[in-house]
Swiss-Prot record:
Residues 14-28 have a biased composition (Basic residues). It comes from Chelativorans sp. (strain BNC1). It comes from the Bacteria. It is found in: Cytoplasm. This is Ribosomal RNA large subunit methyltransferase E. The lineage of its organism: Bacteria, Pseudomonadati, Pseudomonadota, Alphaproteobacteria, Hyphomicrobiales. It holds the Pfam family FtsJ.
Length: 235
């Protein structure tokens, strides 16, 4: 059912309420209500975006300018495709010769302007395959990867940090000089070594939390800009 809720401007916004159903836990019902009433979810549905996560990348790029026409981009953990959509539009990728390549072990529908690989990024063959399909080194490496949550905050943080570190190692090994790296992490206090690695290899490194990332979420993004080049990485 829906219920009218007054907005600050005097307009009315319909708020969706989920009826109580046998077998549906109250926590699941609250999550579903929040999801259905999320303005970013509604915006994604109306604008044809694959997920609300697309707006996280849009907001980060609007502020930090990491994507530009003509760039080549690799998107790690691409499913369901929201970031690929944003990247392809931002770099003006040609559907006939995509300059955006996404990879995920989950199946996802094709994204215009992006090539999609269904394979595990941690597969030994994945890095070479990504560069082969892209046709050269990327200007930007994106990673919205997160390990499946267990409900144990410390464990979830450590598992996602492992993915973030793997993404950072990959970015350092393939990026063009001057390139950018953006990756999801969780607040948890164990990312010191990763930050040190990135600061040695990029001229600017900091955390960002876009408005589309929920306030109660422990999710953060690490943004590393202006890659110093392979010589710095090997030094």
């Amino acid at each position: 059912m829906t219920k009218e809720k007054k907005a600050g401007s005097g307009t009315r916004v319909l708020k969706t309420r989920v009826k109580k159903k046998r077998g549906l836990k109250s926590s699941s019902r609250r999550w579903l209500e929040r999801h259905l009433n999320d303005p970013y979810v509604r915006r994604a549905n109306s604008e044809g975006m694959r997920s609300r996560a697309a707006y996280k990348l849009i907001e980060i790029d609007d502020k930090h300018h990491i994507l530009a026409p003509g760039m080549k981009v690799i998107d790690l953990g691409a499913a369901p495709g929201g970031w690929c959509q944003v990247a392809a539009a931002s770099v003006k990728s040609d559907p006939a010769k995509p300059s955006v390549v996404g990879i995920d072990y989950l199946e996802m529908d094709p994204v215009p302007g992006a090539a999609v690989l269904q394979m595990d990024f941690l597969d030994d063959a994945a890095p070479d395959r990504l560069i082969e399909v892209l046709g050269g080194s990327p200007d930007v490496v994106l990673s919205d990867m997160a390990a499946p949550t267990t409900g144990h905050r410390r464990t979830d943080h450590l598992r996602t940090m492992q993915l973030c570190e793997a993404a950072a190692d990959f970015a350092i090994s393939v990026l063009k000089t001057g390139g950018n790296f953006l990756a999801k992490t969780f607040q948890g206090g164990t990312e010191g070594e990763l930050l040190s690695l990135l600061k040695r290899n990029f001229r600017s490194v900091h955390h960002v939390k876009p408005p589309a990332s929920r306030d109660e979420s422990v999710e953060l993004y690490i943004l590393a800009k202006d890659f110093k080049g392979r010589q710095a990485a090997e030094g």
